[in-house]
């Protein structure tokens, strides 16, 4: 006999192992590439696809029923082609970029515009603290796949450093609702 030393959350207190596996396993083959996950993804140079696994990440698409319900963090896989990336932004929580395949240039930036680029390869990562302006670009010759984790189950949408993008940061959600 084995003993669970911690209680299950109320919503799965009486669930079978099969029910738990059905709700808490996510497979890449079942993920849909979302090329409109973020407002800046409409802009050339920022086009990328989010594959949501746990929660919505910084996309704000919290109604996605095809994801594992988030408890303490989110997890997505990003696909970024050469020459693309994302706009400089902040979050209210830590964000991690962990490269799986390919090469990525992550950056951190201060409010004066000073920027430091960090080249990342497979199995390398950067943890971006809350409130620190950051982002990435794929300046290599091949696509890159990397994990993105945010340290909260329902983080706010991206806090773009650019004023116009920030003003429209939720517009992609309104378009999805139509």
Q: Where in the sequence are the language-model features?
A:
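Short beta-strand His + acidic residue motifs that chelate non-heme Fe in jelly-roll/DSBH
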Residues: 86-89, 106-108, 128, 134-140, ...
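A short hydrophobic beta-strand segment most commonly corresponding to one strand
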Residues: 96-98, 127, 141-160
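Short, conserved beta-strand element in jelly-roll/cupin
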Residues: 72, 77-82, 90-110, 149-152
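Short, solvent-exposed loop/turn segments that connect beta-strands within catalytic domains
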Residues: 66, 111-115, 142
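A short, N-terminal "cap"/entry segment at the start of jelly-roll beta-barrel domains
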Residues: 1-71, 164-178
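Short acidic-glycine-tyrosine-enriched beta hairpin
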Residues: 110-130
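A structural connector/turn signal
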Residues: 75, 85, 94, 115, ...
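Conserved short histidine dyad/triad with adjacent acidic residue
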Residues: 56-63, 74-91, 130
